[in-house]
Amino acid sequence: MVDAPHSKCGTFGYVGSSPTAPTLMNTYTRFDISFKKGNGCWLWDEKGKKYLDAVAGIATCSLGHSNRILRKKLSAQLKKVQHISNLYKIEEQEELSKYLTKQSCAESVFFCNSGAEANESAIKLIKKYGNTVHKGKESFILAAESSFHGRTLATLSATGQPKYQKGFEPMVKGFKFFKYNDIASVKKLFEELKANNQKASGILVEPIQGEGGVIPGDKKFFKELREICNKYNSLLILDEVQSGVGRTGKMWGYENLEIEPDGFTLAKGLGGGHAIGALLVQKKANIFTPGDHASTFGGNPFACRAAITVLEEIKRRKILKNVLERGNQLNEGFTKISAKFPKIISGIRGLGLIQGLVINDSYTDAKTITLKAFDKGLLLVPAGGNVVRFVPPLIISRNEINILLKKLDLIFEEM
């Protein structure tokens, strides 16, 4: 999962950023700018300055800004019904669930409103599974170091970065952490649990770590994770809040790893800029019964229509092909730029249109580069590990990638 902008750990905590109205709680530090118009991959501020957006609302605006088809479909939906609650059947929700299950390994879907809510749902599901299957034994949820799963107390407890947890202790009990892409670390945890007559009810893990530094999952590691979960009767749930819905060039992040999880979570790009989250599960994990979980707004007709439209447009416009092509173009450009500026760039990571430049911290930092990009009319966002993150709309064109690379080259040239 990828984090929302915050000040405590510095995603947007820039020097010179401006506080907003005193009527807003002080949870963010923001740029002193307000965008008034958007179209495709571009935004315009109140002074008319144009920006190429490689943030996309933090990997959210899949179809770009002010998409014509999305506007048309949502306008029509508002003329029908936008919210009625889950006391009643919702046709749009059923349509979306069929679309999602047809295209994935899942058989059932629970809808909510965000990535944190989707991961909270996954945590509850894993806990119920453990209490059902491993009766009488203390069980734990395993998660990765450097992960990010959300800001609710349970998802924060599942996040393997103590800096986010500081000040909110005690964390929810029942989580243990392993090193990402290190199967020996996972096996050690399972052996320790077995020795203590304890169980792992499930593993919650990202197929590509976003906030942790744009770190792709290793195929061999995930295949062994799948085998271990099968052996110990533990669920394998993937957090695809950031990597799902085409971001990596595959429809789902797990497809890059050549495995099938027992479930996975979605949000961000699913609604194309509109709030929706989802937990998708296979038969083994389809254990919720009425009363186990709920969401007032989850799966409302408006949000579901947005998601249906996003999925339809991805298919109609062959957007996955564009993500792969533009991702390759971006990577090739990064390779040339890193060769030109080896003192600044120490690595390139990512898949499709979630990529990161690892910045040599002895030279500068990701925040500084992001600020300089802002001045050049390019919107970027940092990630952990001194990484500059690139998550543009999935519709970005060849010419727009070239513009991005030229701006980036100029930024490094001036440093």
Swiss-Prot record:
Binding site for N(2)-acetyl-L-ornithine: R151, S295
Cross-referenced InterPro entries: AcOrn/SuccOrn_fam, Aminotrans_3, Aminotrans_3_PPA_site, Class-III_PLP-dep_AT, PyrdxlP-dep_Trfase, PyrdxlP-dep_Trfase_major, PyrdxlP-dep_Trfase_small
Subcellular location: Cytoplasm
Pfam families reported in the protein's UniProt record: Aminotran_3
EC number per UniProt: 2.6.1.11
Keywords (A to Z) from UniProt: Amino-acid biosynthesis, Aminotransferase, Arginine biosynthesis, Cytoplasm, Pyridoxal phosphate, Transferase
N6-(pyridoxal phosphate)lysine found at: K268
Single GO MF descriptor: N2-acetyl-L-ornithine:2-oxoglutarate 5-aminotransferase activity
Required cofactor(s): pyridoxal 5'-phosphate
Binding-site residues, pyridoxal 5'-phosphate: G115, A116, F148, D239, E240, V241, Q242, T296
Biological pathway: Amino-acid biosynthesis; L-arginine biosynthesis; N(2)-acetyl-L-ornithine from L-glutamate: step 4/4
Known partners and oligomeric status: Homodimer.
HAMAP family for this protein: ArgD_aminotrans_3 (MF_01107)
Miscellaneous information on this protein: May also have succinyldiaminopimelate aminotransferase activity, thus carrying out the corresponding step in lysine biosynthesis.
Family: Belongs to the class-III pyridoxal-phosphate-dependent aminotransferase family. ArgD subfamily.
Annotated protein name in UniProt: Acetylornithine aminotransferase
